[in-house]
């Protein structure tokens, strides 16, 4: 099916935003059905797809025309009081439109969970949607998954913020419920295989990772991967899903309605008990520790301009289409200044920073910070610098990560920190001169990391604007 046309709904969502580029890479033609096409404007692949404006509840004649496989990734969780009924109506409309258009296959990503009366409203709705999509004579493949691991996934972001912010947690009973988390890269691979296979397939497949664990185990694994101290979990049996969803809304940026449905779903065991999707579609499940480590790795890479991404890692990072709170917490201090000088003359001055030259502002504060770093085993300011700036070289207590003359200098902190920090300068030609953008970025690790930023932030207000002004002032025109 490499030359087939595939309709993807939910392309601006978490899974859809990762599935579309994978499908394009496999050689299929992609059409995206979106209510608001402007939401796809930031996607790097938008020019390679056919975009149709509309909703799954609308007339889908145009969207379905000439389509071989229709992918259903829409989920209206918490969208109004009648969202369960609306989901069912939309799915039925989609299935009937697919049948009328002669679509060969529907592929749907649903939710794991034993189909009985104990299922949460969220999971029951997911499975009812699957049944509605399969109600016509169009072959329907339903991939059921539980917790998906990757930056941008609501489940993963909830896990991330809970583990990062709270070293001690009072926990409800649902943290002891069994689940089978799966890496986003595995989900994308399974979906691509289900969409592109030439085999006649249909029915329900269940997707899970190699480990069956509890949510508490996941938090412990996250803490280990993130270099945090072991989380202390104190069981409190009377903490209901309703109360815990409001608590999650308080300590994480995940919206309360979404947190409520996610928590309600965690009351149910979400493990593979039926036909295994990974085996059926030839996908090797990624271990949880590896999946979390990759998600954390690309979270850090996301702050670093780079041209390299492992073909697997790319699925784990937060994308332009994800919510603003996806990808973890990043604190930043950004300053801009313009100069009549061209970029090469500004960069020539910038390239002298550090070592004996110093840091242009707050020299005593830099030295005190270096001294404190040495006291706790860090490199301090004693390493100095080489005459030329080269990627990988030390620069006081920084490491040079990127040098692109005359536009970019990026430094990564190697001082002892409860997090990761970068200092970047971008030089952009502007009206015959230069726009200089100086950005300090900090990704905190745990509660201590957040407290650290609160302590040093007032000093940034003094040091960074003066530093930028003095760099620009010190630059001299070339004769």
What is the predicted function of each stretch?
Residues 38-101, 111-118:
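NAD(P)H-binding glycine-rich loop region in Rossmannoid oxidoreductase-like domains
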Residues 28-35:
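Conserved glycine-rich Rossmann-like NAD(P)H-binding loop of the short-chain dehydrogenase/reductase
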Residues 330-331, 338-347, 351-418, 470:
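Glycine-rich portal/gate segments that line the openings of hydrophobic small-molecule binding cavities
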Residues 194-261, 269-335:
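Mid/C-terminal beta-alpha module of Rossmann-like enzyme folds, strongest
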Residues 9, 33, 73, 106-111, ...:
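SDR active-site strand-loop-helix element
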Residues 413-461:
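Beta-strand/loop substructures that line and gate deep hydrophobic ligand-binding cavities in soluble
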Residues 2-28:
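N-terminal Rossmann NAD(P)H-binding glycine-rich loop of SDR-like oxidoreductase domains
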Residues 11, 19, 26, 116-228, ...:
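Oxidoreductase cofactor-interface core, primarily capturing Rossmann-like NAD(P)-dependent enzymes
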């Amino acid at each position: 099916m490499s030359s087939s046309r595939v309709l993807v709904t939910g392309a601006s969502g978490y899974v859809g935003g990762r599935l579309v580029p994978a499908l394009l890479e496999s050689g299929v033609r992609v059409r995206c059905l979106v209510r608001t096409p402007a939401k796809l404007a930031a996607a790097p692949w938008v020019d390679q797809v056919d975009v149709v404006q509309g909703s799954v509840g609308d007339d889908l004649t145009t969207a379905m025309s000439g389509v071989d496989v229709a992918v259903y990734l829409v989920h209206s969780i918490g969208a109004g009081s009648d969202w369960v009924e609306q989901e069912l109506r939309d799915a039925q409309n989609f299935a009937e439109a697919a049948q009328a258009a002669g679509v060969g296959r529907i592929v749907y990503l649903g939710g794991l969970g034993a189909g009985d009366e104990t299922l949460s409203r969220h999971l029951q709705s997911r499975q009812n949607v699957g049944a509605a999509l399969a109600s016509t004579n169009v072959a329907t493949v339903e991939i059921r998954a539980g917790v998906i691991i990757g930056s941008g996934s609501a489940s993963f972001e909830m896990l991330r913020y809970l583990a990062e912010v709270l070293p001690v947690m009072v926990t409800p009973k649902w943290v002891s419920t069994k689940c089978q988390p799966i890496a986003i890269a595995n989900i994308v691979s399974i979906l691509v295989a289900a969409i592109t296979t030439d085999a006649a397939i249909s029915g329900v497949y269940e997707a899970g990772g190699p480990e069956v664990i509890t949510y508490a185990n996941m938090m412990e694994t996250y803490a280990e991967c993130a270099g945090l101290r072991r989380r202390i979990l104190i069981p409190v049996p009377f903490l209901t899903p309703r109360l815990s969803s409001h608590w999650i809304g308080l300590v994480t940026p995940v919206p309360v309605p979404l947190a409520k449905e996610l928590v309600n779903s965690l009351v149910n065991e979400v493990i593979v008990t039926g036909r295994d999707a990974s085996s059926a579609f030839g996908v090797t499940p990624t271990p949880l520790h590896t999946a979390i480590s990759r998600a954390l790795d690309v979270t850090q890479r996301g702050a670093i301009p780079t041209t390299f991404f492992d073909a697997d890692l790319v699925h784990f990072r937060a994308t332009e289409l994800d919510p603003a709170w996806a990808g973890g917490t990043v604190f930043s201090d950004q300053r801009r200044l313009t100069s009549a000088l061209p970029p090469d003359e500004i960069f020539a001055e910038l390239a002298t920073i550090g070592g004996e030259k110093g840091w242009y502002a707050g020299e005593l504060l830099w030295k005190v910070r270096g001294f404190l770093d040495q006291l706790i085993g860090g490199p301090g300011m004693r390493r100095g610098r080489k005459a030329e700036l080269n990627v990988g070289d030390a620069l006081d207590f920084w490491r040079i990560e990127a040098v692109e003359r005359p536009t970019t200098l990026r430094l990564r902190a190697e001082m002892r920190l409860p997090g990761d920090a970068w200092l970047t300068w971008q030089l952009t030609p502007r009206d015959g001169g230069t726009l200089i953008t100086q950005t300090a970025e900090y990704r905190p690790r745990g509660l201590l990391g957040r407290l650290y930023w609160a302590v040093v932030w007032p000093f940034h207000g003094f040091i960074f604007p003066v530093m930028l002004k003095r760099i620009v002032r010190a630059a001299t025109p070339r004769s």
